[in-house]
Amino acid sequence: MPIESFTHQLEEITYLSDDLQVKALMMTPHHEVKRIVVYLRGGKGQVGRVRAGRLMQFSDSQTLVIGPYYRGNNGSEGKDEFYRGDLNDVTELLRLLHDKYPQAFIHMVGFSRGGLQGLLTFQDLPVNSYIIWGGVSDIDLMYEERVDLRGMLRRMIGHPKKDRAAYEARQAIPNINENSPPILIVHGGKDQQVGIHHAYYLADQLELKGDTHETFYQMAEGHVPRPPAMVETLTYIKEFMNQVELHS
């Protein structure tokens, strides 16, 4: 059942992606939709699942916010393929939103695991900007730094040396160019889950490619900023979106 507030309707929706029933959590404003924020979650399963509180951070009276669960997660059909078929869950959702709200600005926010999810999809979609927040930018860096996740990565993708093609297929940087939408890189200097070297690496690569980008580093913060820093982060992200829309 949808939940109504004074400004939005909150509901879980289901859409088709590769003939699979995939779920997403959506906050729709009662007023005209002028901006859409697509939040790409981190984690897997219950860890990092999309919650209303997270979506509310990006909402206002004319902003629709939505977070796909990805296939194989939280009631969605299929199997989580970790940056393969689940990418279609992002692209299909974006196209549905663009068809329904063709005049609305669309911004993607990729958090943690969702960082690479966005990098692998955003340049081919009708989006105005991409914000990567505490996000994975390189699958090999992820394997190298997260010893605790290597078992899961080997099960889902393979070994980075023995199954090299599977890892190369999950590399986003080669597909990004100077015509890609503007990118904002947000990261905490004390992030222990996705090290800030992911942000540094991405920024260096974007500089080489001549892609429009900004960085917002909070060197005293971890994976999730503390409340005062969270306010600063959200303020910066929203102003970035405003500036992108102003110059679009």
Labelled PLM ranges:
Residues 1-30:
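N-terminal cap/lid segment of alpha/beta-hydrolase-fold proteins
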Residues 34-43:
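Short beta-strand element of the alpha/beta-hydrolase
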Residues 49-67:
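Short amphipathic alpha-helix adjacent to the substrate-entry channel of hydrolases
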Residues 81-100:
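Alpha/beta-hydrolase active-site loop
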Residues 101-112:
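Alpha/beta-hydrolase fold nucleophile elbow
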Residues 135, 140-175:
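Mobile cap/lid helix-loop segments that gate and shape the active-site cleft of serine hydrolases
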Residues 179, 185-187, 191:
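Short beta-strand/loop motif that positions the catalytic acidic residue
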Residues 200, 209-248:
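C-terminal catalytic histidine-bearing segment of alpha/beta-hydrolase fold enzymes
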